[in-house]
Amino acid sequence: TKNNVVAVWSGIMLATSLEFWIISHAIITDSMLMLFTVPTLLSAYIGLMENNRRHMVIAYFSSGLACLSKGPVGLVLPGMLLLIWCGLMRNKKLFLRLFPWQGILIFFITALPWYACMYAIHGDPFIREFLGLHNIVRATSSEHPGDNHFYYYFLLLPFSLLPWTGLFFYEIKKQWKEKTSFYLFLMVWCFGTLLFYTLMATKYVTYTYIALVPAAVLAAHAAPDVTSGKKIPGLLAIIPFLLLLAALLAGTFFFPDSQWWPLYIVTAYSVWVLLFRWHKNSHRRLTAISTVTISALLVTVNAGLPAYMHTRSGYIMSDYLHKLPGQHYFFQSYSASFSYYTGETATRLIPILPSEDIQNIRDARWKEKYAMPSITEEEFLKLKKEEPVYLYVSKGNLSRMEKWSLNNRFTVEKEFIDGTIFKLEK
C-alpha cells in the first residue's frame, strides 16, 4: 500500500539525509534527545487523534526520558509544538486529551528522581550551572554571537536534508490545499522547531536535527510519484542529489593527499544510472539515489576524515606542546583535547582585546562554562617567568592574536593545521 511505501522511504530518507547521517555518527546528546522526542510527538499524535490514553502515557514517559537526556527542552519543545497544532486544529477535545493525569504522573516518576538527586548532591551549583547556564543563559545570551542570525536555521535546513530537499518542498506545495491533520502536524513539528530555536540566542547546527524527522516523512510522500515516472518529482529528486555529489567532489580538493578514486567511481556510476538511463530506470531512481548517497558518504568518511580530523582535534599539537619544557597557556579558548591526550591541565589566558573586537565576545555569564584554570592578562604580566612560556592560539583566534597588545612579545614556535604555538621572548 501507499502508506507502507511512505513508511519505508521515511526511514530511508531520514537515514541518508546529510545532517542526520553526520550527527548520528557523533557522540553527542542530540541523538538521545531525538530518540525520545520522536515517540513523544508521534505517540501524542496518535493518542490525541484516537483518544488513546495509553499512547498519551507513552508520550509523557518518552518526554521524561528526553528531559533526562538534555534537560527541560525534552518537555518544553514537544509541548509547545503540540499546543500549536491543537490550536490549528480548532478542536477543544484535543486540548483536554493533551493533559491526562496518568501521563503527567508517569512523567514526574520518570524525570523527577534524577533532578531531585542532583539537587540533593550538588545543591545550588546544579541549579546555577545546569538549569541556569546551560538552559536559561543559552536561550537568552548567544554563546557564538557571530552565528546569531534570524535566518540561520531556515537557511540550514535545505542543506541538512540533502539529497531529499526537493521532494520535501514538492510535498509541502502538493499537500498545502488539502491540509490534513497529519500534514499540519508535520509542518508544525518541522517549522515550529526551527522557529523555537530561532528565538533562542545561541545557535547550533545540531538544533535542526529533530526537524529532519517530519521533513523526511513529508519528502517520503513523494516516493510514489517518483517511482511512477512523473517528471517534476523525478527532477526534484535528482537535482539536489547531484548538488550533494558536486559538493562532496569539491571537498576532495581541500584534501588532495587522500585516496578519492572510490568516490569518483561512485559518481560516475550515479551519472550513468540516473542520467543516461533516465527513462528506463524511473522505478529505481530513489533506490539508486539512496544507495549512491550512502556509498558516497562512506567513501568520504573513510578517505577524508583522517585528514580532516587534524583540523578539529588537537592530538598532534597536544603531544608537541606537552613535550616543550616550561609553562603552557591557551589563548582565549581552551582545547579540551590537550588535557585528554596528555593528562596535563594547562591554563587559559584571557586577553584584553581591542574595542572593535568586543562585539564578537560572549556575554560575561558564559565565563562560568570554563571549569579549567584561567588567568587574566594583568595576572599573566605579573607572573615570574623563570622558565619558557608557550602560548597556543587556535586558527580561529589568530586574527585576534594579531590585534593583541602583547603580540609583538611572542614568536612562532610551531605551526599546525588547527593553530599555532608561540613562545614568549624574554
Identify the residue ranges that each predicted region occupies.
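Membrane-integral, polyisoprenol-dependent glycosyltransferases
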Residues: 1-232, 282, 344
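Membrane-embedded architecture of ER/inner-membrane glycosylation machinery
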Residues: 57, 171-426
